[in-house]
Regions:
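Signature of Gram-negative outer-membrane beta-barrel scaffolds
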Residues: 1-28
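Extracellular loop and loop/strand-boundary signature of outer-membrane beta-barrel proteins
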Residues: 2-7, 57-63, 110-117, 152-157, ...
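Outer-membrane beta-barrel signature, preferentially recognizing the C-terminal barrel domain
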Residues: 9, 26, 38-87, 94, ...
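Residues on the lipid-exposed face of transmembrane beta-strands in outer-membrane beta-barrel proteins
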Residues: 18-22, 65, 75-79, 90, ...
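Repeated loop/turn-to-beta-strand initiation elements of outer-membrane beta-barrel proteins
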Residues: 27-30, 83-86, 136-140, 177-182, ...
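Transmembrane beta-barrel strands of outer-membrane/channel proteins
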Residues: 32-36, 77, 88-94, 142-148, ...
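Outer membrane beta-barrel strand-and-loop segments of large Gram-negative receptors
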Residues: 60-62, 66, 81, 85-143, ...
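C-terminal beta-signal and adjacent terminal beta-strands/loops
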Residues: 212-276
Length: 276
């Protein structure tokens, strides 16, 4: 009845990986590894049915898409102590058949949006994760990453490159009267795509928690987030040979609230020890 909705697709892939780890001490090690990751397109990427949002705008999937294969080579360092846990990872990855969404204007002036295995991507990145017990009552956590990405497509005649990354930090403090205070914040750099980029973003928040009743079964939390700038503004830009599109939108991000959680039941764990 609707032949343009009928399609089938099978994927068969081999996924190799290898790693070598060397202990520098009882609490630290380095690791070199290679792995391949798969990104199989979902049904919305494959479905060829044409959806017309407006007379001049149509979108559809591509049933000929193949599995996107990402190859990655990494070098990581780990150290674990009573005060600090640290992981640092340097990585180079590449994709030769990346799935991308792209748009073009046809002879009738209609903008077509679909997908193809048209992108070659190279990415170099460095990431760090750290957990630091500053005192018995104070802890700090940091997660940060930075990368440079280069995207190219001969089929579409497009290329783009740039720096990206994100940052998240969290401070926890144990206060008198069984109160736990948490402050957190984060930042995300613009996301780079083949035909454009999105804007950056940031967020932050505070929370105050306290447990009640026997075995701390009930927890009450007061929280607030993004209270200095209630409205967050975002933007994204798409550039092709035939048109340029810039979108602006905003979201009400400010939040204040109270939450209550109650733990039911109990779990007792007995660990059997073996004496040598």
């Amino acid at each position: 009845r609707h032949p343009d909705r009928n399609f089938s697709k099978n994927f068969d892939d081999v996924v190799p990986s290898a790693a070598i780890s060397y202990g520098l001490s009882e609490m630290s090690n380095i690791r070199v590894g290679y792995n391949m990751r798969l990104n199989r397109p979902g049904i919305w990427f494959l479905n060829p049915f044409r959806i017309s949002a407006t007379p001049n705008d149509v979108s559809y999937g591509n049933p000929d898409l193949s599995t996107e294969k990402s190859h990655s080579i990494s070098l990581s360092y780990n150290i674990f102590t009573s005060k600090v846990n640290l992981n640092a990872d340097a990585r180079y990855s590449f994709v030769n058949n990346g799935v991308t969404g792209y748009s073009f204007v046809d002879e009738d002036g209609v903008r077509n949006s679909t997908y193809g295995n048209y992108v070659r991507t190279q990415r170099t990145s460095l990431s760090v994760w750290m957990s630091w017990n500053i005192t018995d009552k104070t802890s700090f956590m940091l997660s940060a990453s930075g990368s440079y990405v280069d995207l190219r497509s001969k089929e579409l005649g497009s290329s783009n490159s740039g720096f990206g990354g994100n940052l998240y930090a969290q401070l926890q403090q144990r206060l008198p009267w069984k109160l736990d205070f948490t402050a957190y914040g984060g930042y995300g750099a613009p996301y780079i795509s083949l035909q454009g980029r999105s804007g950056s973003y940031n967020f932050y928040g505070l929370s105050l928690n306290r447990s009640f009743l026997k075995e701390d079964r009930m927890e009450v939390s007061l929280f607030a987030s993004d209270f200095f700038s209630a409205w967050k503004k975002y933007s994204s830009t798409t550039v092709t040979d035939t048109y340029r599109q810039t979108s602006h939108y905003k979201d009400y991000a400010c939040r204040f609230g109270v939450s209550l959680s109650w733990r039911l039941g109990s779990m007792n764990v007995n660990v059997k020890r073996t004496e040598r």
